[in-house]
Amino acid sequence: MTGEVGSEVHLEINDPNVISQEEADSPSDSGQGSYETIGPLSEGDSDEEIFVSKKLKNRKVLQDSDSETEDTNASPEKTTYDSAEEENKENLYAGKNTKIKRIYKTVADSDESYMEKSLYQENLEAQVKPCLELSLQSGNSTDFTTDRKSSKKHIHDKEGTAGKAKVKSKRRLEKEERKMEKIRQLKKKETKNQEDDVEQPFNDSGCLLVDKDLFETGLEDENNSPLEDEESLESIRAAVKNKVKKHKKKEPSLESGVHSFEEGSELSKGTTRKERKAARLSKEALKQLHSETQRLIRESALNLPYHMPENKTIHDFFKRKPRPTCHGNAMALLKSSKYQSSHHKEIIDTANTTEMNSDHHSKGSEQTTGAENEVETNALPVVSKETQIITGSDESCRKDLVKNEELEIQEKQKQSDIRPSPGDSSVLQQESNFLGNNHSEECQVGGLVAFEPHALEGEGPQNPEETDEKVEEPEQQNKSSAVGPPEKVRRFTLDRLKQLGVDVSIKPRLGADEDSFVILEPETNRELEALKQRFWKHANPAAKPRAGQTVNVNVIVKDMGTDGKEELKADVVPVTLAPKKLDGASHTKPGEKLQVLKAKLQEAMKLRRFEERQKRQALFKLDNEDGFEEEEEEEEEMTDESEEDGEEKVEKEEKEEELEEEEEKEEEEEEEGNQETAEFLLSSEEIETKDEKEMDKENNDGSSEIGKAVGFLSVPKSLSSDSTLLLFKDSSSKMGYFPTEEKSETDENSGKQPSKLDEDDSCSLLTKESSHNSSFELIGSTIPSYQPCNRQTGRGTSFFPTAGGFRSPSPGLFRASLVSSASKSSGKLSEPSLPIEDSQDLYNASPEPKTLFLGAGDFQFCLEDDTQSQLLDADGFLNVRNHRNQYQALKPRLPLASMDENAMDANMDELLDLCTGKFTSQAEKHLPRKSDKKENMEELLNLCSGKFTSQDASTPASSELNKQEKESSMGDPMEEALALCSGSFPTDKEEEDEEEEFGDFRLVSNDNEFDSDEDEHSDSGNDLALEDHEDDDEEELLKRSEKLKRQMRLRKYLEDEAEVSGSDVGSEDEYDGEEIDEYEEDVIDEVLPSDEELQSQIKKIHMKTMLDDDKRQLRLYQERYLADGDLHSDGPGRMRKFRWKNIDDASQMDLFHRDSDDDQTEEQLDESEARWRKERIEREQWLRDMAQQGKITAEEEEEIGEDSQFMILAKKVTAKALQKNASRPMVIQESKSLLRNPFEAIRPGSAQQVKTGSLLNQPKAVLQKLAALSDHNPSAPRNSRNFVFHTLSPVKAEAAKESSKSQVKKRGPSFMTSPSPKHLKTDDSTSGLTRSIFKYLES
């Protein structure tokens, strides 16, 4: 590029001298050019070109010898000037061709006008110094790493030359040139080597920055600029003349490419070079301004904080500021060499200012001013002006650059101190190539500058020494930098910074200063904030959690006196209040409170179970001494079977347990109240024995999951859980499928196992219980084969495990059945040998504290029926035997089906019958149904409410449930069927109320619900239950069988309906029944949308209904008060004709003849209008009369809605029954009132309205009914606005007309005698809906 530029400039400039210069320069520039090789340069230019290339490749140039350095130092004068000239030419050509031409003209004139040669030579001397300096800078920068001594020699030579320049005498200049020629001769040898080593590799670098046309770096301009400042333009002109001469001589040598520099032309070349350098300096003066301005622009761009030359890593950003060391890649070296000139200028300025005498410093200013003046005296004053401007601007630019560079050097030093590694410096070189290269060049030039000033000033090496010392100090500081040249660079930089007054002691740091960021927010006063916090703590002291307290509570206890009478005694019970923790403090996690509650419950249950087991074991030992051996064997068989079954189902249960555990967690969170407690009790019982707990948890989870999935089938999915479910009536009741007998057996078994007596003890207990209850004895002997409850689980945790399993399925499922089973099992806690004691106790706890869950005292009583009866009396509970009897009657139907669903074999049904109390006759005899119901109801209440409270609490609940069961025992089958079919498991009160309301259709209590579930599962189970009832009470069995038959029929019907409606699907969840009631809101919250959404929906619905009501009212008012034609006048084209067409035959318009559509404009219209008014009056009157009745019935229907088919069915049944009783008188009265009203309406329509009150006075509900009734099509939508689309078959409409006419005619005579509708309202609440009034409307 430079060569091309030179040629182009040559074309522009016709002066042969200039051409020769250009030609000579073009190769030299080519040294910097990317495409030309610097290889064989002419003698004169070869040195300069070499040094130019060396400048660019300062860092990589290796000095072969001191002589080479000398040559390098000698030639750099010319080299600097030549390169600067060429650079200026190129830059000016690229940006300022006119200036280049002027410069060349000036050079030519300087050649021609030899008179100015003296001035030029003087200026040359002045600028030979800068040239020497630049050459030394370039040469030393090149050879700096290799030899400082050689640089010193060059400096001394240059010092002599500089002194001559100061004198501004030609003689000195010539001597200087001679010396330089000598140096060049020595250098020439090195130059050749360097040309081979440096020039071509430099060209190979292909750096575009070398191309000055493309990149006007102004680096070399800057190198010369300080010299220019130091030396006037006169020297530049002299140098231009010499260089022009030089180029003339050089042209052939350059063209030939032969280096004849050694051959003696060096002297003349020196002069020529001086001239060239002077001319080049004059060009550089112009070029510097441009290049430095561009450099300033580049620097500003580089230094801009937001300028990011390339994507860098965070490490690069950290390393950004440090200046590159002399080592670097080709690009970095090229840039550094280019930017070196500016740094050289700055360094020379600083070094001269500090090290040079004031003479030299003033001399630089004189040079600058003189250069400006001499430029003015040039043949081309324009060029001189430009140079003046350039030099002045260059100085200013240099000052700015010096400042910027100094700042950058400081930062670089800081960062270099931080990161002394050369790798970092290289990275920094890449990042801040310009700054880094400048500094490296500064460093390289540093020594040169330090020497040059003192050479120029003749100060001797003291200044260089000082400079060296100064450099050494920064070197020590910058020892971290890996390479010597960088150290020197840093030395010089630090030296310069010190000279500039910069505090070098400041250590760099990665963190930004406080002032580096603009913080708009006011500074926070930390002390004040801390004070506020302390004050807040004092003002609002954290409420300390209340420690656990023991409070004595006065309790009235029923106690048995020594004489056997019950007495109420005052007792003091110590109650330990749980430590009260702050809500926010202790419970930070979502489920933490629940977990803590669970843990506490488990601990409490462990203690309670342990105590109860001990009591039970003692009771078992006392009561079941004889029976333990037999029952132990039976229990072993049962446990084996249960284990086998459990093992088979353990895997399934484990999977199900995982799901159930999640469900349980959700349920527990929902039920966090009582249900959580109950679940925790169950879980705690499960946990009592770790092994048992684990098994129980698995079993319970599996069983509960299975129960949910299978409808609470108590399949022994896990050894303990299945066995507990089947063996323990409580578990079966929880599952909701065990018959009462089966439940009692399971309860006995559960009692045996929970007691955790040895198998002998548990067996003996079973045998004893069975002896007390023959059914249980049979169970012990025959059923043990199927009692999958694991003894391990049963003894320690089986009962609770099952309870835990069951609780998770859905506590409501176990309401009635669980209560009944629990009560039975509790009644027969003598069964403790069964492993399900925990589940048994959980569900039977309320009926009998003796059950496993009951307190220790309760458990003691549960051991045997006899002991239980006594204990129950002492505790105030009914005998467990009675509970069992009640339960056994209820349960027989459920167990079979449940067992079948539980994957029981066909033989298992028999086993279930036996286990469930097909031997229930004895159990039932022992346990009156009343106690059963009480206990079961209590248990159910507890379970349903989600309260798995202490066994004591569960016991009263079960007893209450037993009472309820007894009360509802008559309607149990129907209630169960209804409840199951409808999917609603109402409370016992609801059941009783429904029983009263619906008679046979009673909603079964939860126990009965489970029984009904069992019945649903298998009719055979019901039959077995019936058989058991026969054993217990044949009368009761007969009653039950009848009820069961009805129930089964009803159940089949309801089941079919449920299957169709899908209500059966939710039955399992609905088994939760009463428990669901407790946390029903939570469940609803899960299903329903948010309150806002609900509110918005309700508002929409309300507004819609209001709008419909308004529309209905408006239509009624229109019909009443507006003429027939005006009714739809609001819509254009919406004539009565249209209305008549689209209305059904049974609609209001049907009152008018269908033909009225065609004849509306004719006479029929009048007739129809009259008839319409008449009918409307009659209809309104009748509606007023029937508004209340219709309203009531409609509201009932609406209330029933589509929620449950069972409710609809029950309503229908009751409605039919009521209609049978009251339909005739109601019909008569209605007809009378209707007939009366129409006639009255016809004659005095307005008077009639006044009598009955206007529609405005009617309540909104009545108006709605009226609007609905006004639509005669019963199948049509209620909204009158849709009447247009009602369709009735014309035949039906006609038939309806005829029938209505005939009926009206028949009953016409009785109009006057009918009582007023007001009195008739109360008579009929249902028939009004079923009967159509419109048959009376047409006469």
Curated annotation (Swiss-Prot):
Changing residue 1085 to A: Does not affect cleavage by caspase-7 (CASP7). The modification Phosphoserine is found at residues 26, 42, 46, 53, 65, 67, 83, 110, 113, 225, 260, 516, 718, 720, 723, 731, 744, 762, 808, 810, 833, 839, 846, 950, 954, 958, 1012, 1018, 1020, 1156, 1289. Its main location: nucleus. One of its GO terms (cellular component) is Golgi apparatus. It comes from the Eukaryota. The record marks 1072-1073 as: Cleavage. Transmembrane segments: none annotated. Required for checkpoint mediated cell cycle arrest in response to inhibition of DNA replication or to DNA damage induced by both ionizing and UV irradiation. Adapter protein which binds to BRCA1 and the checkpoint kinase CHEK1 and facilitates the ATR-dependent phosphorylation of both proteins. Also required to maintain normal rates of replication fork progression during unperturbed DNA replication. Binds directly to DNA, with particular affinity for branched or forked molecules and interacts with multiple protein components of the replisome such as the MCM2-7 complex and TIMELESS. This is Claspin. It comes from Homo sapiens (Human). The gene is CLSPN.
